[in-house]
Amino acid sequence: KVERTDGNCNAFFNGNSINFYTQAGGCNTLAIVADVVYHEYGHAITNYFYNALGTQFRNGAVGEGYSDVYAITLTDTPVLGVGFNLNSPNVIVRRYDINPKIYPQNLVGQVHSDGEIICGAWWRTARNMNSNSGMMEIFSESLYGLANGPNGSEGVVYTDILIDALQADDNDNNLANGTPNLNAIVNAFAFHGIRMLANVQFSYPPLADIPAQTPAPFNVTLSITPPFNTLISGA
C-alpha cells in the first residue's frame, strides 16, 4: 500500500503487505526511494521463506539486517535512504562502509541498530570476495539453515548464521578442509565480532622444578576442532 496518510517518514511490512507513508513531515513518499522498497520487500521474503519451511522468523535485528542486505546489494551501494529527507538531501538512514557496528560492544537492543552488525558482516563478505553476486549466492543458500532465536539472543543467532554461511559455501561436505570462500567469510564476520566457538585442548610435557624468575621455555601442543585448524594451518 502506498501513499498512506496515517503516518509519515516510515515504511513497514505487517506480515501481509508492505506499506509506505505519503510525503509529509519533511519526508518524501518512501515508495519512490528504491532501497526502502527493497528493504521492506526483504522483510516479506524472510518471513515467507521461514514460514514456508515450517517455522516462524523471530529475531528483529536479523530481520532488519537481512532486509538491508537485499537493499544494499540491489542498489550496489552501502548507503541507504538517500532522498528520503526533503529538506536535507544529504541525510541518510544507514551506511555500511564507515563506522562498522561490532558485537558485542555495539549491541544496544534496538533492532535497526543491532541489525547493522549482521548486515555489515555480509557486506564485508561481498567486499572480501569482490562480488555481490557471489556473496548473495552464499547468503541465499545459508537461509536454509533457518538461523533463528528471540530478540536478545543475537550472539547465538549471529554465530549460527556464520556456520550456515560456511555450510552454504562448502563444496565437498567436509568443513574440516575449509570452503572455497572460507577466509572471506570468516574474516568479514570476525571484523564485526562474530566468531565461532572452538574446542581447544592444550597438552605439554611434565615440567621440572625450576628456580623462581628463571626463564624455562617448553613446547605446547594446541589441538583445535575443525574447521578452525584450517584457519591456522602453517601458523
Where are these regions (language model features)?
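Buried hydrophobic-core signal for structured, non-transmembrane domains
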Residues: 39, 220-222
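Short, solvent-exposed loop/linker segments at the N-terminal edge
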Residues: 207-218, 230-231
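Extracellular acidic, Ser/Thr/Pro-rich low-complexity tracts
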Residues: 222-230
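Extracellular protease catalytic domains of secreted zymogens
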Residues: 1-209
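Alpha-glucan (starch/glycogen) binding determinants
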Residues: 235
